[in-house]
Amino acid sequence: MPPKSSTKAEPKASSAKTQVAKAKSAKKAVVKGTSSKTQRRIRTSVTFRRPKTLRLSRKPKYPRTSVPHAPRMDAYRTLVRPLNTESAMKKIEDNNTLLFIVDLKANKRQIADAVKKLYDVTPLRVNTLIRPDGKKKAFVRLTPEVDALDIANKIGFI
């Protein structure tokens, strides 16, 4: 029986080719060297600015506050009381303006919103001042369509 043509010769040849390729790449690496010279960035500033890195948003397992806080400045806390002195009555009659003693931390927008909510009138403008006794006084000017005297009667201090 004649010997069959060997198919094992081809893998040896291909493995020899891969070995030659490996040897050539190794030669290239040896010629090039492992520690190649890299181009460095020239620093022109003496201060080192830390680079901005990725900051992921927090994903808490549970909320740290069990109950949300009640609103700290509601309409009833904003307006402490109406002012009904003689000069306040003159402002009501002449300038269509209501006077209130308000919370010291309330701002003009909060005062206007509180007047709108409690007395159903839209104020034209709000002026404030801090009195010498440390309380805040608000002058709430009403629109010409609304009479301040009627609102004062509705509040109940006339």
UniProtKB/Swiss-Prot annotation:
GO cellular-component term (any): ribonucleoprotein complex
Keyword Transport: no
Keyword Ribosomal protein appears in the UniProt entry: yes
Pfam families linked: Ribosomal_L23, Ribosomal_L23eN
Start-end of Low complexity biased regions: 12-23
Protein name: Large ribosomal subunit protein uL23
Family stated for the protein in its record: Belongs to the universal ribosomal protein uL23 family.
Residue span of region Disordered: 1-43
Annotated InterPro entries: Nucleotide-bd_a/b_plait_sf, Ribosomal_uL23-like, Ribosomal_uL23/eL15/eS24_sf, Ribosomal_uL23_CS, Ribosomal_uL23_N
BP GO terms, sorted: translation
Keywords: Ribonucleoprotein, Ribosomal protein, RNA-binding, rRNA-binding
Coiled coil feature spans: none
Gene3D superfamilies documented for this protein: 3.30.70.330
Protein purpose: This protein binds to a specific region on the 26S rRNA.
GO molecular function: rRNA binding; structural constituent of ribosome
Superkingdom of the organism of origin: Eukaryota
